């Protein structure tokens, strides 16, 4: 049984090398690039990846395209800023060699913020269904955070691996804010597409406050120190921004209709 690693990327030269080096042992690496202007594609080719170029259609469709171009019996889906540790690699190899293995496996994830593992506040173990038999996984859910699920026609039983992958998405505050700006915009567009039109004091002020209080105090985010404080504070800002952008989108559409 072989393993394909599926990755989508754009301008990820700062992290893609470490990610690809961690899975060089895989039988195949498929990287779909959506127009990088840095060295992402060059680094990927140097690491032995098969690089495919495709304009960005959205995360679900781009990941699906990567899956479709995998040729091995098993697929491991990774983000461009995730690393497979040696212990996790050994566990994955054990799964794909097992003839009685299930159709999919959840992998815990260590999320790093400013270089620190955030163990509390709901950020760990953060399990993701990332390892699955080829042809049996499908992207589902709305942008900006769609997920992998098993296709309904297959056995839905899944397993859980013990060793976490490492997710180093936010090495700086600037990188975190840039990601959250993108996510809040995508989340707002998805909400408006579903018909959400609300604008309220609750959404803009109270919902972010409640999010901070719940994650920082009740889910023990304060145990992550200063990094935990900043993470949950700016996550609350993200929530407020998303609902403000929903209002902005609906206001713009209303103005356009009114002027037509």
Per-segment meaning from a language model:
Residues 25, 70-73:
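Active-site acidic short loop of glycosyltransferases
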Residues 7-28:
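Short, well-formed alpha-helical segments that are part of the catalytic scaffolds
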Residues 64-67, 74, 85-253, 260:
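Catalytic-site signature of metal-activated, phosphate-bearing donor transferases
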Residues 34, 54, 72, 79-82, ...:
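Short acidic donor-binding/metal-coordinating loop in glycosyltransferase active sites
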Residues 2-4:
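Cell-envelope/extracellular polymer assembly enzymes that use nucleotide-activated donors
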Residues 14-17, 38-47, 87-88:
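Acidic helix N-cap motif at the loop->helix transition within catalytic regions
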Residues 54-70:
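Glycine-rich, basic loop-to-helix element that forms the pyrophosphate-binding segment
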Residues 22, 33-42, 79:
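A conserved acidic beta->alpha catalytic loop
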């Amino acid at each position: 049984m072989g393993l394909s690693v599926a990755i989508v990327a754009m301008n990820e030269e700062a992290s893609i090398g470490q990610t690809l080096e961690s899975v060089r042992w895989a039988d195949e690496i498929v990287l779909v690039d959506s127009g990088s202007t840095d060295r992402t594609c060059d680094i990927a080719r140097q690491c032995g990846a098969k690089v495919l170029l495709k304009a960005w259609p959205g995360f679900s469709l781009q990941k699906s395209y990567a899956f479709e171009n995998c040729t091995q019996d098993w697929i491991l889906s990774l983000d461009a800023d995730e690393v497979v540790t040696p212990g996790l690699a050994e566990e994955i190899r054990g799964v794909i060699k097992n003839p009685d293995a299930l159709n999919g496996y959840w992998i815990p994830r260590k999320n790093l913020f400013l270089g620190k593992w955030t163990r509390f506040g709901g950020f760990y173990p953060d399990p993701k269904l990332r390892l699955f038999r080829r042809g049996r996984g499908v992207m589902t859910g709305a942008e900006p955070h769609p997920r992998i699920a098993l296709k309904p026609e297959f056995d839905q039983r899944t397993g859980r691996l013990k060793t976490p992958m490492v997710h180093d998405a936010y090495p700086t505050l600037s990188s975190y804010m840039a990601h959250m700006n993108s996510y809040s915009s995508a989340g707002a567009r998805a909400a408006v597409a579903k018909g959400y039109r609300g604008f309220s004091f609750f959404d803009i002020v109270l919902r972010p406050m409640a999010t901070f209080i719940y994650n920082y105090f009740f889910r023990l985010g304060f145990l992550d120190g200063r990094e935990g404080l900043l993470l949950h504070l700016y996550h609350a800002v993200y929530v407020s921004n998303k609902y403000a952008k929903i209002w902005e989108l609906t206001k713009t559409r209303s103005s356009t209709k009114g002027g037509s």
